[in-house]
């Protein structure tokens, strides 16, 4: 059961206060996310930000009894589809502000990392979506219709903050079902992100890292899985000034040791194994182009006949420290799960334009960042699932509160018209019932006036 909130907590105000504290309105203006007339871009953005906690999509909300709290559907979709908005810059500005605050809460020597990974955003039933492509899903081991969401995040071991993303289509034209719309002005931010969506995955990954560093986001290492841990990638990240820790596959790549080239399994014979531990040992070698790396051999609990190999370009780290730091990579997997399960990543809007998908993804990333901000500021040990449902329940409880108070007021009004004997009997029963309820229900009826 999710923990009950105290009587004075107001989730909407709490979320809105975080938005104000982070100066979201200023960040939107800096990223050219503005409107020339009508309701402000800040109000539209804040509505879309909180929409997921209402338990309804945009269509259902605009057809509900609370539709007076919203503006027209066209206003929201024009906002999502605008090609002039620089969502990439907005997310970088927000993440830089949040990571700076988180860094101030920890000691300077604490390791901070950038985590790189991808996840497929499916559009299985779509046909006319802009830049829709045939992409490979490494989880289900088959091709899907949709996009590869390449994501870069920041972590200090306690918090995870999404820094940037690229909704990759496909670098191969033969794998793309749709191309860039002819109506897009080539001078806009929208056209630029469309061109970036057709970059190869390694090129897009390096671009994300360089942008994060240019925005002032500080990190000591980049963590990657087996797909990204390649020699060209290591070289590019070293040029950018960052060391890498990643897992490597047992392929045909060779590493130089004592003047000879060996594969990963062949290097095992040079390591003194300690079978009683999970970390068997390590060895320092060089890659084909001369990059010195440290390879740590770790027990594979899923398949005891094989080992796992962790590679670090920082050879000064101990074996245990390399394994510990690499464990922070799990935070991005939790982020993907939370974003898709709770924050409706990829399912909240089914628009056909690439701009709408980018703006929606940025809104989801912003939701996650603000939830993390609230959790960190309050030193809250809740999981993201608990925090999400706490927000939803509080909004629903406010509606229930109003309903109960209105019902009781109507009851008291009709009650006053009855005879004195019946009134005394009913008043006694109602008072007895109220006293048997929980304290938060009793508090709703403290100010009831029984006199006509």
Q: Which role does the model predict for each range below?
A:
Residues 27-100, 108-109, 155-161, 198, ...:
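Short, positively charged, Gly/Tyr-enriched micro-motifs
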Residues 1-39, 51, 67, 167-171, ...:
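A short, flexible helix-boundary coil/loop motif
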Residues 81-172:
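Active-site-proximal, Lys/Arg-enriched surface segment
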Residues 125-127, 230-237, 253-260:
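A short acidic (Asp/Glu
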Residues 110, 114-120, 319-350:
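Short amphipathic alpha-helical "interface-anchor" segments enriched in bulky aromatics
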Residues 57, 74-81, 139-218, 295-309:
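Electropositive, glycine- and tryptophan-enriched low-complexity nucleic-acid-binding patches
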Residues 242-253:
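Acidic, His- and aromatic-enriched active-site or binding-groove loops in soluble protein domains
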């Amino acid at each position: 059961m999710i923990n009950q909130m105290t009587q004075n907590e107001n989730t909407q105000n709490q979320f809105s206060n975080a938005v104000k504290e982070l100066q979201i309105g200023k960040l939107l203006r800096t990223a050219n996310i503005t409107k020339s007339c009508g309701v402000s871009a800040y109000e539209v953005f804040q509505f879309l930000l909180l929409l997921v906690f209402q338990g309804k999509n945009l269509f259902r909300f605009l057809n509900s009894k609370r539709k007076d709290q919203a503006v027209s559907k066209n206003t929201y979709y024009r906002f999502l589809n605008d090609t002039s908005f620089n969502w990439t810059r907005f997310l970088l500005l927000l993440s830089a502000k949040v990571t700076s605050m988180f860094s101030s809460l920890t000691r300077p020597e604490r390791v901070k990392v950038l985590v790189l990974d991808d996840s497929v955003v499916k559009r299985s039933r779509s046909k006319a979506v802009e830049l829709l492509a045939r992409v490979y899903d490494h989880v289900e081991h088959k091709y899907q219709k949709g996009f590869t969401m390449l994501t870069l995040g920041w972590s200090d071991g306690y918090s995870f903050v999404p820094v940037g993303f690229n909704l990759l289509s496909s670098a191969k034209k033969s794998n793309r079902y749709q191309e860039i719309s002819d109506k897009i002005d080539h001078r806009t931010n929208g056209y630029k992100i469309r061109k970036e969506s057709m970059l190869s995955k390694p090129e897009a990954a390096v671009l994300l890292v360089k942008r994060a560093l240019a925005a002032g986001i500080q990190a000591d290492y980049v963590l990657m899985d087996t797909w990204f841990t390649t020699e060209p990638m290591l070289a590019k990240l070293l040029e950018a000034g960052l060391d890498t820790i990643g897992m490597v596959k047992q392929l045909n790549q060779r590493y130089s040791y004592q003047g000879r080239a060996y594969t990963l399994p062949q290097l095992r014979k040079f390591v003194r194994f300690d079978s009683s531990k999970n970390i068997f040992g390590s060895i320092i070698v060089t890659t084909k182009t001369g990059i010195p790396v440290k390879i740590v051999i770790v027990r594979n609990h899923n398949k005891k006949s094989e080992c796992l190999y962790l590679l670090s370009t920082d050879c000064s780290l101990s074996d245990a420290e390399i394994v510990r730091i690499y464990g922070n990579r799990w935070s991005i997997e939790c982020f993907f799960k939370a974003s898709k399960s709770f924050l409706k990543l990829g399912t909240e809007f089914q628009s056909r334009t690439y701009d709408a998908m980018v703006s929606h993804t940025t809104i989801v990333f912003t939701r996650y960042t603000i939830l993390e901000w609230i959790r960190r500021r309050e030193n809250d040990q809740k999981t993201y699932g608990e925090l999400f449902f706490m927000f939803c329940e509080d909004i629903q409880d406010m509606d229930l509160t109003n309903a109960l108070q209105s019902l009781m007021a109507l009851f008291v009004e009709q009650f006053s018209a009855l005879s004195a004997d019946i009134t005394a009997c009913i008043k006694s029963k109602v008072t007895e019932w109220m006293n048997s309820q929980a304290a938060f229900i009793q508090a709703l009826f403290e100010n009831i006036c029984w006199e006509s």
